């Protein structure tokens, strides 16, 4: 069992393979956090609780000053209940902001897990166990359930909560987090993934905690290019390989909040959940509301160990089993080749060139139903002038060539110049007669079932008979004036996301193919999207030098198989030149494809591309199933280096990228990581055979990698040998 309960002491001890999470029910029926960290024996650790009562701290008993909720760690912290730290839940009953006192009532432990209403979540597995803690506010008949689902083999605990109004009057929720976690002490650095459009997650922000509140989040109606739902706490001396690291990530794709606060006593509180800016959710009698799920992991093997825990969990328990460990398509996308001028003739020409390059899937991007950004979204009607046989006929021709076929959609949007908008101007998110516009489009009001069903049916009708293998789902603007003609204002953002998830579910059931999501590049790169699509377009920035930073940061929280990386023209966003080999080595960190006009390249070029496609297929098992070890950070050096290592340690691949000419790259010695110390490995470049222990301690000379000194990007494979 992963979940232990000491009935006499009322202590819960959640164990994974390498971590322990311990909390208890206090003498006053509050749920008190005690410990999270390296795995420990099942001892009574109540002694760590702070029973000191400080001046102005309220305490439970008039006769005793032994317990104050302001002094101890808590699993949930209601507002106005004696805890003066940032609350994790705020609600009022019948318009009164009452004292939100919550008491433990009962718990249950069981194999498996429950789904979360309308929300993505970690999937059920044979090893999964769940603990439910039920608390109540008896004065108002309000019930809150805390969920802890354990994935022991990957050192992950998934947390969420559910609030139910058991009373007779309305309950208004002003703040609902997914988890609250308290630590005694503040000796932490906080790490987040920051960025912007064309530079998502490229800035790894790390700072020491100080007294006060640190907040990371989004209010844009999506997880955003600027901030990511991942956050980590680590010791000051933690690096890639050594030290304690706690990682957290929210399975959600809209507005979120991550708050880290340090109290006057120097204790640390982390809360993650729905952003409460403008949030106001009403529960009528008998109704309930579930929070999104947070996954959390602990590692004492540095940030690299934390990342590998996340990678394993996402691949094993979030991405659909059908795709998680299966070869992915090598695609050619029409956008960089044709933009809005794409035609049936041009896409068939692109397909012919693709056959010469080892590509197996042709993706028709934006332009199949319109010639610019001004119109077409929402109507989804094929431009028969440019596609005379329709998408159905085109897909059949692509299949006849021995290729697979994919198509681009943006189902959540509508153009003002569309039949749909003219017929239903009230079907958009807006609070104004003159709504703000972005990219010549509005966001459809998916809080309304009739809108969700209409879009699902319109797309289904248009794609009827198409021989479809792949769908790219885009989302190209932020939400502004987010209001609805039918939905309460304070519920808009969350109901909108629930509607989007519903639309995903409908279309995935009707089109059981591989989905790849996108949002102006990586604006919705989160675990909520990975529940529906096994890979995400990482960024619209296809400059390989910039992609090094983007992909490196993304790898902190997301597995290689989720990071969509393509070989590109190389200079389309920055003008910087790069060699083919450098571009391939950058793109081979994740799932592979091409973003360029193949007709512009020679037969020799296409032969080179085919070689890259074949190399990718040969090494794809490392991307789908292997472990990632980061060796050199591009933020700290002029280089980037990482290793992909098979789970059985029988194969490894080193990639080294030179971002700036330094003149001493050939003199560098690089220590490898992740190998089996006792196994011998052959360097396929030099033929040299050395033991893993030697390669990880002595290292290799980088100059031995250099074949073409102008490349600046090198990879070498190390198979284990007898």
Can you say where each PLM-predicted feature lies in the sequence?
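Conserved, mostly hydrophobic/aromatic
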Residues: 18, 161, 286, 332, ...
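Active-site neighborhood of glycoside hydrolase catalytic domains
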Residues: 388-390, 422-424, 428-581, 591, ...
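Short Pro-Gly-centered flexible turn/kink motifs
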Residues: 99-106, 281-300, 712-719
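Polysaccharide-binding surfaces and accessory modules of carbohydrate-active proteins
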Residues: 5, 10-17, 31-261, 277, ...
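Carbohydrate-binding surface patches
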Residues: 231, 240, 633-677
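C-terminal beta-sandwich/jelly-roll accessory domains of carbohydrate-active enzymes
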Residues: 660-722
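Glycine-rich, aromatic-flanked loop segments that form ligand/cofactor-binding clefts
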Residues: 71-73, 78-112, 242-255, 298-322, ...
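Aromatic-lined carbohydrate-binding/catalytic grooves of carbohydrate-active enzymes
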Residues: 323-460, 464-466, 470, 478-481
């Amino acid at each position: 069992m992963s979940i232990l309960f000491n009935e006499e002491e009322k202590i819960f001890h959640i164990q994974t393979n390498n971590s322990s999470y311990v909390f208890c029910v206090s003498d006053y029926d509050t749920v008190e956090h005690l410990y999270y960290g390296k795995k420990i024996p099942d001892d009574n650790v109540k002694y760590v609780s702070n029973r000191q009562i400080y001046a102005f701290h309220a305490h439970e008993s008039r006769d005793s000053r032994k317990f104050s909720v302001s002094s101890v760690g808590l699993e949930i912290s209601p507002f106005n209940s004696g805890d003066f730290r940032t609350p994790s839940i705020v609600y009022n009953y019948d318009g009164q902001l009452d004292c939100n006192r919550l008491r433990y009532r009962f718990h249950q432990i069981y194999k498996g897990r429950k789904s979360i209403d309308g929300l993505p979540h970690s999937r059920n597995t044979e090893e999964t166990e769940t603990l439910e803690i039920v608390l109540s506010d008896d004065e108002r008949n309000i019930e809150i359930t805390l969920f802890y689902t354990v994935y022991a083999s990957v050192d992950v605990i998934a947390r969420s909560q559910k609030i139910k109004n058991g009373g007779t009057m309305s309950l208004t929720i002003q703040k609902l987090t997914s988890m609250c976690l308290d630590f005694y002490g503040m000796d932490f650095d906080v790490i987040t993934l920051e960025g912007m459009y064309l530079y998502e997650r490229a800035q790894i922000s790390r700072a020491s905690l100080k007294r006060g509140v640190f907040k990371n989040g989004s209010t844009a109606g999506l997880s955003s290019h600027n901030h990511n739902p991942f956050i980590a706490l680590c010791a000051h001396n933690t690096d890639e390989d050594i030290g304690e690291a706690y990682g957290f990530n929210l399975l959600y794709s809209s507005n979120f909040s991550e708050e880290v606060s340090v109290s006057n006593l120097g204790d640390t509180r982390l809360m993650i959940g729905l952003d409460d800016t403008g949030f106001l959710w009403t529960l009528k009698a008998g109704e309930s509301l579930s929070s999104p799920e947070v996954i959390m992991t602990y590692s004492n093997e540095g940030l690299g160990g934390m990342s590998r825990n996340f990678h394993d969990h996402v691949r094993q328990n979030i991405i659909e089993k059908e795709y998680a460990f299966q070869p992915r398509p090598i695609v050619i996308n029409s956008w960089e080749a044709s933009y809005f001028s794409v035609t049936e003739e041009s896409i068939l020409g692109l397909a012919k060139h693709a056959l010469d390059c080892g590509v197996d899937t042709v993706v028709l991007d934006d332009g199949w139903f319109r010639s610019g950004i001004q119109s077409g979204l929402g109507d989804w009607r094929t431009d028969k002038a440019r596609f005379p046989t329709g998408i159905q006929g085109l897909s059949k021709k692509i299949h006849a060539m021995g290729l697979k076929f994919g198509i681009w959609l943006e189902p959540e949007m509508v153009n003002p110049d569309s039949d749909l908008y003219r017929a239903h101007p009230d079907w958009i998110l807006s609070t104004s007669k003159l709504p703000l516009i972005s990219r010549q489009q509005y966001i459809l009001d998916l809080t309304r079932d009739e809108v969700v069903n209409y879009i699902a049916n319109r797309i289904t009708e248009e794609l009827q008979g198409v021989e479809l293998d792949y769908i790219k789902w885009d989302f190209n603007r932020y939400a502004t004036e987010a209001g609805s003609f039918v939905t309460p204002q304070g519920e808009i953002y969350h109901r909108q996301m629930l509607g989007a998830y519903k639309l995903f579910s409908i279309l995935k059931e009707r089109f059981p193919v591989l989905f790849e999501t996108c949002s102006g590049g990586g604006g919705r790169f989160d675990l909520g999207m990975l529940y529906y699509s096994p890979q995400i377009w990482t960024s619209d920035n296809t400059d390989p030098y910039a992609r090094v930073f983007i992909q490196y940061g993304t790898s902190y929280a997301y597995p290689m198989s989720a990071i969509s990386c393509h070989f590109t023209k190389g200079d389309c966003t920055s003008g910087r030149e790069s060699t083919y080999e450098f571009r391939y080595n950058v793109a081979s960190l994740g799932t592979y494809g091409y973003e360029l006009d193949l007709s512009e390249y020679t037969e020799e070029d296409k032969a080179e591309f085919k070689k890259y496609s074949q190399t990718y297929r040969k090494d794809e098992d490392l991307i789908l199933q292997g472990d990632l070890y980061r060796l050199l950070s591009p933020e700290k050096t002029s280089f980037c280096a990482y290793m992909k290592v098979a789970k059985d340690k029988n194969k490894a691949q080193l990639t080294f990228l030179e971002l700036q000419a330094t003149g001493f790259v050939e003199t560098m010695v690089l220590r490898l990581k992740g190998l089996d110390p006792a196994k011998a490995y052959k360097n396929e470049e030099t033929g040299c055979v050395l033991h893993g222990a030697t390669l990880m301690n002595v290292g290799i000379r980088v100059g031995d990698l250099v074949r073409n000194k102008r490349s600046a990007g090198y990879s070498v494979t190390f198979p284990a040998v007898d």
